[in-house]
């Protein structure tokens, strides 16, 4: 069973409601929703102050240690917010391939892949079906070199595999399937697609989160206050619904706004 938490501050604008809430105190409501072979215990914490009282929440959790919650939630000691980038990495790759398929002249595109730990070497093989001479920057060369040799044999296509991040400076479109933890050189007018907001400041137009439509049965289970990307991540990682990894996002978002697959393809 998955457990989610949504914290809702009391409405204290009305004086009489404020007095009533102060007497009643914080409360926790539980609703178990089932479907698709799983159950979600949706906890709603109604708070006078907007903060969580540890004792009250811990009693409601009944020993559960990992919960789904908004990243801004301040949780009691011993309770961990679920966090995984595995699903977002798949969304990033799927979005990138969707964009490449929509670009009018993909053979003229200078594509870069930044995947330091070689989480998504399959991206290179699929990209080589669509564009010419992409650059893959990785610190784990073997998986990418294996893909490069397979692509050369099956597609007659070649790619540059390197550890040098400076190679990304020549790229118009950079795909980084994992969250970026250290500075990488990207030109100012390049588009960067990644999974999760980078930990460092970078140049380029950066998109790091995704809007996705889950299958209807899972949409009905999604707790209020959680994005489909985050809830999908829990279904993918904790419940083993790996088929969700084939979903193509409707759009991607960054600090400058959002783009659909089509609009991003037209922009690059």
Language model regions located:
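A short, well-structured beta->alpha microelement
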Residues: 24-30, 45-55, 150-170, 179-183
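A glycine-rich, Thr/Ser-enriched phosphate-binding loop motif common to dinucleotide/cofactor-binding enzymes
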Residues: 80-98
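Structural motif
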Residues: 6-11, 43-48, 68-71, 113-118, ...
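Adenosine-phosphate binding glycine-rich loop
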Residues: 193-268
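Glycine-rich phosphate/diphosphate-binding loop of Rossmann-like nucleotide-binding domains
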Residues: 103-167
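Rossmann-like adenosine-cofactor binding region
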Residues: 157-220
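Metallocofactor- and cofactor-centric catalytic cores in central/energy metabolism, strongly enriched
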Residues: 9-75
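Short, charged/polar "capping" segments at the starts of alpha-helices
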Residues: 72-77, 120-125, 142-150, 182-184, ...
């Amino acid at each position: 069973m998955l457990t989610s938490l949504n914290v809702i501050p009391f409405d204290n604008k009305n004086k009489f409601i404020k007095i009533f809430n102060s007497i009643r105190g914080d409360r926790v409501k539980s609703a178990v929703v089932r479907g698709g072979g799983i159950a979600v215990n949706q906890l709603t914490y109604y708070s006078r102050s907007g903060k969580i009282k540890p004792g009250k929440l811990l009693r409601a959790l009944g020993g559960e240690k990992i919960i789904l919650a908004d990243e801004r939630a301040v949780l009691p000691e011993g309770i961990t917010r679920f966090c995984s980038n595995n699903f977002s990495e798949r969304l990033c790759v799927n979005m990138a391939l969707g964009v490449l398929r929509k670009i009018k002249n993909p053979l003229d595109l200078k594509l870069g892949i930044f995947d330091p730990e070689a989480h998504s070497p399959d991206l290179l093989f699929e990209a080589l079906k669509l564009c010419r001479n992409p650059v893959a920057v990785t610190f784990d060369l073997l998986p990418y070199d294996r893909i490069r040799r397979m692509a050369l044999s099956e597609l007659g296509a070649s790619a540059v595999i390197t550890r040098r991040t400076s190679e990304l400076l020549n790229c118009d479109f950079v795909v980084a399937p994992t969250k970026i933890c250290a500075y990488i050189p990207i030109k100012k007018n390049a588009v960067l697609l990644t999974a999760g907001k980078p930990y460092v400041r970078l140049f380029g137009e950066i998109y790091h989160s995704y809007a996705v439509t889950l299958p209807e049965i899972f949409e009905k289970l999604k707790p209020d206050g959680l994005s489909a990307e985050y809830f999908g991540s829990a279904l993918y990682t904790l419940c083993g619904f790996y088929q969700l990894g084939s979903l193509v996002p409707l759009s991607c978002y960054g600090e400058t706004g959002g783009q659909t697959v089509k609009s991003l393809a037209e922009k690059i």
